[in-house]
Amino acid sequence: MVRDRTEEFAMLIDAQRSVLMVVDVQERLLPVMQDPERVVRSISMLLAGAARLSVPVIVTEQYSKGIGPTVVPLREALPTDALVLEKMAFSAAQETVVADAVERLRASGRDQLVVAGIEAHVCVLQTALGFRSRGCDIAVVADGVSSRAPHSVSAATARLLHAGCQWVTTEMVLFEWLGRAGTDDFRSLLPLIKAD
């Protein structure tokens, strides 16, 4: 059941309820995106936070035989238990192996999907809308997505917001996952945040 929009936008992103989904940041696709370094930096920070705070990670790869695997900096940053799943559908929600993985995590109480990747107006948009329609709370990371053209990101943003998805930043996610200062987790992640 979908909550009313006031409650949705008041929701904080909770590390205990989250899954991080990294969509199609692949070798032959990333170089033609706007500001690819920003995307890699953002997702690297999210992966470090997810690893530290035990947030499950799902990585999708669109037709990796043709587009290549996930880029090396992100592959090297993946937690050891991250799921890397192949897909052909633009929406990961339409790919059974991905949808089943998300559903297993939802059954354990992880109903918030934090989404980053490329392209914002194609696979990210369709994935976010697909899982939104399945009842997940969706937060799309603004600095962790890109497209070939800026107007494509703008159009995706408008549609996602209209559909009840949240538009957030990497720091918003990390600080909401942390929840408080003074903890070992906070001290561990603070240098990474300050370096950005």
Q: Can you say where each PLM-predicted feature lies in the sequence?
A:
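Conserved Rossmann-like nucleotide-binding pocket used by diverse enzymes
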Residues: 21, 58, 114
